[in-house]
Swiss-Prot record:
Negative regulatory component of the MBF complex involved in cell-cycle-dependent transcription. Pfam families: Whi5. Component of the MBF complex. This is Transcription factor NRM1. The gene is NRM1. Residues 239-260 are annotated as: Disordered.
Amino acid sequence: MVMSLERLPLQEYTKSAMNNLATSGPVIMTSLTEGSSLSKNSVGMGLGMKLPSIHSLINQKNSYNPFQTTLHSKSFSVGDPIKANNSKPLGVTLTSTDSNKRLNTSISALLTDNKSPGKANKPETEKETMNHLVQEDTVDKAHYTELSKKLQIRLQLAYYKYRTKQEHVKFNELKALHSSKPKKASKKNTKRRKLVVSHGNFKTPAKRKEHKLYTTNTHNLQDVSTDISMSSSTSSLMSKRDSSLQFHDSNDTTNDFTTPIRNANKRHLGQKQDTPMSVKAAKSLIFLYSSKV
């Protein structure tokens, strides 16, 4: 078989036992030929497994993979360098108990406490070594699970941005767009009422009230005018009030949100009496003008 024309795929070599070498095993394996069993095998101490030669890989068939050794089986045979009278090597059978003992001793030697250099390193018991290994496995699993969750979330977010064509949008902006909490309506802050001295068309907090005083007075004056016993003085007063009302209404340029122009000469007796808006305001005005401070 030519290597350049026909060779095994890379997957079969990666899954084979040649890439799963035991660091603590004392067995050394060299090469296997197609027709024979273990041709060159030797037993060493703490040297691990040796890779087979390239010729054995080239000369073997595609269906035959000699590197798939069953280490977890009950027994396996390894060649012995000690030879008998015959030229053939003798086979030595190693049971699974022997291999487990050697593995345990090598693991315990690696996990010994090196804090006291003066004393000899004592091997740990099997329970301590197993507990130590289990703790390391749990820590690694917890660490990798957290990393996998973070990566999963980031992948989901990236896929969502790609599907919705929002690659430039940040996570906080997406969260604000999809937030289900209703926004509270901003309440309008009502301003406090203030005593404003008006000298023109200035805005005030309160709306202008209707001139009810004018209407009531006009109704009363109409009733008085219908009376037969109305004097000449009342009729002259009525004419003056009507003329003043007409003059005020014609020159009124104010609206409901502004303070009207107040002229003392144009106002009648009822309008000149300005009272405060509340009892509290009246008391404050009385205290202001009566105090000697």
